[in-house]
Amino acid sequence: ASGGTFDNAQLMNRNQTTDKPLLVIMELAANDVCFGQGTQPEDFRKNIYRILDWLDTVLPPGSHLVSIGLVNGSIIHEIMGTKTHPMGMPFNDFYDYLNCVGVDLCENYLTSNVTKIQETAAKAMALNKVYEEIFSNYTAKNYDFVHYDFPAEWIIEKWASQGGDPFDLISHVDGFHPSQ
C-alpha cells in the first residue's frame, strides 16, 4: 500500500552529487484497496506526497519517475472467476477458500462477491483521481515525472486481438499476478 511504499522507498540510498540520474517506476497496483476498507483518499494523498517529497531529497538531479495508477481488479474476476484452478475448482471457489483460511492476496478483489469487487474497483478509481490531482499540481526539483493509468484493459484487448486468451495473462497458480 502507499504507506508501505514510503518505507520501501527509504531503502533507496543515493548520492545526489555523484550518482547518475535514475529511472524510478512506482506502481501500487491494488494494494491500497485489497484489504479491509482500503486506504482513504486523504490518507492516500498524504502518502503519495510523502513519497514524492522524499524522492526529491534522494534522487540525483535529472532523474525520472514513472507512476502507474491502480488497476481495476474487477477484470480479474471477469477473466478468472469461472475458469478452473489447477486444484480442480473454479477460481471463485479458490478465492473464497483463501479468504476463509485468511491467506488471500487481495480479499477485496479475489472473491466471488461481485458487490464487493465493484465497490473495490470504485475505490481504486477514486484513488486514481487523487493521483491525477497530485500529478497535475506537483513540482519536483530533482526529477520529472509522468503518470499513466494502469493499462490492464488495453493489454488484454491487444493480447486478444493477436489471438491470445486473456486467461493466459494471469498466473494460474494464484489467479492474481501476471503470468510470466
Regions of interest found by a model, annotated:
Residues 1-53:
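Conserved SGNH/GDSL esterase-like catalytic core that processes O-acyl groups on lipids
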Residues 15-20, 58-60, 140-142, 149:
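Extracellular/periplasmic catalytic domains that process cell-envelope and extracellular macromolecules
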Residues 19, 70, 77:
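A substrate-binding/cap region within the structured catalytic cores of diverse enzymes
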Residues 22-27, 32-34, 63-69, 146-150, ...:
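Structural recognition of the beta-strand scaffold that forms the well-ordered cores
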Residues 32, 73-76:
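Surface-exposed, flexible loop/turn segments at secondary-structure boundaries
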Residues 75-180:
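Catalytic His-Asp segment of secreted/periplasmic serine-dependent ester chemistry enzymes
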